Amino acid sequence: MMSENITAVEPQENNDVEADSDPFNIDKLIVDYDYLLYKIQDELESIQLKTLEICQKQNEIVEHGIIEEVIDGNIGMAKDLLQKCDDLEKHYDQLDAVEGIVVSFKSRLKGVITQYKKYIDTKK
């Protein structure tokens, strides 16, 4: 029975020994401090990853926005060039029409000149 009492007392003595060796709970404070540093580091890494993701997304948005603006600008310039080409084509069509008028005018003028010469020859 005595050994039972001693056994029951030993853990208490261990607690007393631990309490005596660390009366201010420095070991627990160190563990808590290390855990706090770990949590801070973990939170910083989490914030860093989120910040990096946000920056990458913003960068993509800016790049796509800039690229879209450049593409839209190029499309606008291409449309302007196509409009100018259409205008030139209309001018060429007008020139072709004028050429047709000139060719028909020349043939009619030759006919008029021929008739006039015949008329003059008949008057002589």
UniProtKB/Swiss-Prot annotation:
Put simply, this protein is called Biogenesis of lysosome-related organelles complex 1 subunit CNL1
Question: What PANTHER family would the database entry show?
Answer: BIOGENESIS OF LYSOSOME-RELATED ORGANELLES COMPLEX 1 SUBUNIT CNL1 (PTHR39145:SF1)
Q: Which domain of life is it from?
A: Eukaryota
Which UniProt key words apply to this protein? Coiled coil, Cytoplasm, Transport
Q: List the transmembrane segments.
A: none
Coiled coil region boundaries: 75-98
Task: Give the family per the record.
Answer: Belongs to the BLOC1S4 family.
Q: How does it assemble?
A: Component of the biogenesis of lysosome-related organelles complex-1 (BLOC-1).
Q: Which InterPro entries match?
A: CNL1
Key word Hydrolase present: no
**Does this entry carry the keyword Cytoplasm?**
yes
- Species of provenance: Kluyveromyces lactis (strain ATCC 8585 / CBS 2359 / DSM 70799 / NBRC 1267 / NRRL Y-1140 / WM37)
Please give the residue ranges the record annotates as the region Disordered. 1-20
Biological-process GO terms, alphabetical: endosome organization
